[in-house]
Structure formats: C-alpha cells, structure tokens
C-alpha cells in the first residue's frame, strides 16, 4: 500500500497530526496505524471483575484510539508551566499559544467551556506571597475538566471526524520496523497478528507515546537516529488534614508548590570530608 503520510500511533500526538493536516486543507492520503482498538471497541474487564487481567497483547486502557486519555478524568492543563519540556524546546510564548490553539479544538468537539482555577486574583496573590516566604513557588494552572464520560465522547467525535474526512485507520495493527533506504524513511513494516504487510509513504510520523517509548528507543538505536528520552516524574502521595490545605484548595482548583531547599553543609566524622 502507498500513502502520502503514515502516522504510527493514535494517541493525542498522532490524532492532532492528522487533524491539523485536515484543518489546513490537505488532500494527501493519510493512514493511521494503531496497535490498540477503535475507541468504541475498547473495554477493560476490570470494570466487571475488579481485578486487572493483564490483557494481551495490549492493555485496552492505555492503548487504542486516544490512548489513556479517553478513560482518564479528562483534565486539560492550560498553562505552559505544567507538563513537560515544551517551553524549553520552543519557547514559552509559542508553547502557550499552541496550548490555547489545541484547547479551542477540544471546545469545537464538545469539551465543557467552564475553566477551573481562574478568578480570585487577590487571594492567589496572597497565597503566592506566603509561598515565597516559605521557600516555595506556587504554580497555579487553569484546568478544563471534561470528566471521564465527556473525554470519551470528545475523542469519539474526533475519531469519527477523521474517518469521515478520509483518514484510513488500521487498528489492532503493530508497527514492526521502519522501511529505511539509506538515511531516508520510506514507510513502515506492519503486522496485524495474521499477516505482515507494509505501507510505503512519502512522510512517516512516529507518535507512539509513553506506551511505545521502549519500542521507539529500540528503533532509533537500530537505525542510528539520535534521540533523547524525556524525564518521568516520580513522586509520593502525602495526605494531610483538610484544615492544612483548606485555604489553597478553596481558592485554587489544582495547584503545585515547588520547593527550593535552603543550601546546607553536610559534615562527616572527619572534618576534612566536609561536603
């Protein structure tokens, strides 16, 4: 099969790649390949059993059209200070403009217009000042909270829109490798579990997301493609009495406090080993 563009992965990155091409009037033949299922065919047995069944070959919560987004609580963080290295890569101004642009697309497909965490500027200012005195930086981020059911409906609408506008989708289909001719990618080798086949394309977009990170790292290493993994935030959950956080929670829907420890000296038993 031949195509103008083949997109590997139908998570948010792959979805918005196809969506943006259509919005710009592209007439190119676009093919999306996803190892999970179409959204309306995704279901998790844990909803009935209460126990994770470790579904094979894929988890239907994290793979399939829209990735984990369709079964999340549908929170869209609308400030560039939250969520990744995009401001560092393209600058804060462009990052924020891009977030605002993507947010408008979600609204077009039915996302709730209400935004949490805005207003109360004076109360936020006072909380920020108190945080600074405590050696903390307050990050207050507006949140568009779609909710699980609305997130599912929004992504289902996007899926149908792409199909109605000619995007071909191959579900339950895994990318095995890239078709490389010299230093040029000419498409992808695929398998649907029953047969192997290939799609040759003028442009190949690999958008496998966090779930496909190990596979992408392997492919890049095999083909000599320079790459750098992004960071993964690991933290702990600390629960405190409501009275402690009540003021912040009443003013801010969702906030982050970044701590900056004071400089300190660490001594060992030997003064010469001062650090």
Give, region by region, the residue ranges found by the protein language model.
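Beta1/beta-strand and adjacent pyrophosphate-binding region of the FAD-binding site
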Residues: 2-13
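Single conserved hydrophobic/aromatic residue that forms the stacking wall/gate
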Residues: 267-275
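Conserved N-terminal/central alpha/beta ligand/cofactor-binding core
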Residues: 35-165, 222
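Gly/Ala-rich phosphate-binding loop of Rossmann-like dinucleotide-binding domains
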Residues: 18, 22
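Core beta-strand elements of the Rossmann-like FAD/NAD(P) dinucleotide-binding domain
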Residues: 3, 195-203
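A conserved short coil-to-beta-strand element within the FAD-binding core of flavoproteins
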Residues: 171-184
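Short beta-strand "acidic-cap" motif of Rossmann-like dinucleotide-binding folds
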Residues: 29-34
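Glycine-rich loop(s) and the adjacent beta-strand/alpha-helix scaffold that form part
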Residues: 203-252
């Amino acid at each position: 099969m031949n195509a103008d563009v083949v997109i590997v992965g139908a998570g948010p990155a792959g979805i918005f790649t196809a969506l943006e091409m259509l919005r710009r009037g592209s007439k190119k033949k676009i093919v999306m390949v996803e190892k999970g299922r179409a959204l309306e065919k995704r279901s998790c047995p844990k909803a009935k059993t209460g126990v994770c069944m470790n579904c094979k070959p894929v988890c239907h919560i994290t793979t399939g059209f829209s990735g984990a987004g369709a079964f999340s609580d549908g929170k869209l963080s609308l400030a560039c200070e939250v969520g990744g290295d995009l401001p560092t890569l393209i600058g804060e101004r462009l990052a924020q403009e891009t977030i605002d642009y993507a947010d408008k697309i979600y609204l077009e497909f039915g996302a709730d217009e209400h935004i949490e965490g805005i207003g109360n500027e004076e109360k936020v200012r006072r909380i920020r000042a108190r945080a600074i005195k405590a050696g903390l930086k307050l990050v207050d981020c507006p949140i568009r909270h779609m909710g699980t059911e609305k997130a599912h409906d929004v992504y289902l609408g996007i899926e149908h829109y792409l199909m109605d506008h000619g995007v071909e989708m191959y579900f339950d289909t895994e990318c095995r490798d890239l078709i490389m001719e010299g230093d040029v990618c000419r498409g992808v080798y695929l398998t649907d579990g029953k047969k192997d086949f290939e799609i040759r394309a003028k442009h190949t977009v690999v958008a496998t997301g966090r779930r496909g990170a190990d596979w992408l790292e392997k492919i890049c290493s095999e083909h000599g493609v320079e790459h750098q993994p992004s960071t993964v935030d690991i933290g702990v959950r600390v629960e405190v009495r409501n009275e402690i956080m009540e003021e912040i929670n009443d003013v801010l829907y969702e906030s982050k406090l970044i701590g900056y420890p004071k400089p300190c000296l660490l001594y060992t038993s030997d003064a010469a080993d001062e650090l």
